[in-house]
């Protein structure tokens, strides 16, 4: 599994279940789920439960990722939101997940005093070449959130989904998502290909941008040539690579994609008013 001592990147599976504390070190609750913005390839929001804290009962709460900071040695996340704000927050029932669009989520961000991440720059279109962002890029969520056409998908739902190529051949499945803790981006997707192309039991780090959801088929399309996959350097399930941006640059470059932090920098520099 991914190394827990790496403070910059953690797998979604590792984050899920982590404790949440306040700035005074008091236990607040835990992270129940990460909801992924499929178009932007990042954590749209974290789903927290607070147990009986402040009489908040069994409801769940959508919290902006920016409000959480990892305290590495405590294996906990610090939530820097005032008690009163949490007390008056509108939660939701575990059987009724309401936040399925950015419009709905923007109200939650505003309530907690955060600017929605998609308003900080021009959101990049990440469909495949020659395709547009439309119904094929819409997403499904877990059963509790409905499987209509929301814009977010839980990390738990993504994990285990099948991956196919353009010819519709099964390639493998998604094993994990590695999260960049700095901004909640999906640093890379971990795929297994089984016996496809003789790739054995190794795992492979794949840029999120290389995947496109086929919503009605409940699977992801991977648009990378067979030869490229065949020659890719995988890693053993018991020996995950130390993730850093230098290593990620090599991975992204191999598959022909620009690293997400470079795209972000370009968007900021190209905003109107910037010289």
Language-model regions, residue ranges each:
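Peripheral interaction segments used for macromolecular assembly
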Residues: 1-275
């Amino acid at each position: 599994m991914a190394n827990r001592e790496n403070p910059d990147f953690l797998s979604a599976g590792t984050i899920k279940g982590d404790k949440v504390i306040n700035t005074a070190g008091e236990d607040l609750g835990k992270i129940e789920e990460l909801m992924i913005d499929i178009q932007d390839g990042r954590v749209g929001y974290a789903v927290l439960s607070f147990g009986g804290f402040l009489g908040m009962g069994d409801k769940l709460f959508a919290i902006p990722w920016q409000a959480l900071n990892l305290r590495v040695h405590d294996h906990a996340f610090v939530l820097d939101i005032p008690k009163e704000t949490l007390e008056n927050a509108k939660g939701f029932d575990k059987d009724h997940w309401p936040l399925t669009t950015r419009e709905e989520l923007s109200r939650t961000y505003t309530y907690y005093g955060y600017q929605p991440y998609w308003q900080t720059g021009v959101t990049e279109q990440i469909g495949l070449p020659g395709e547009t962002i439309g119904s094929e890029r819409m997403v499904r969520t877990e059963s509790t959130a409905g499987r209509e056409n929301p814009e977010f998908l839980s990390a738990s739902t993504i994990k285990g989904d099948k991956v196919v190529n353009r010819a519709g051949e099964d390639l493998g499945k998604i094993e994990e998502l590695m999260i960049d803790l700095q901004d909640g981006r999906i640093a890379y997707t971990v795929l297994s290909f089984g016996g496809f192309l003789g790739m054995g039991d190794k795992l492979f780090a794949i840029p999120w941008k290389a995947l496109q959801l086929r919503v009605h088929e409940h699977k992801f399309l991977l648009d990378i040539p067979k030869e490229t996959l065949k020659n890719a350097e995988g890693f053993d399930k018991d020996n995950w690579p130390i993730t850093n941006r230098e290593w990620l640059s090599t991975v992204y470059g191999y598959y022909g994609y620009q690293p997400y932090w470079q795209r972000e920098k370009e968007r900021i520099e190209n905003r109107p008013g910037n010289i």
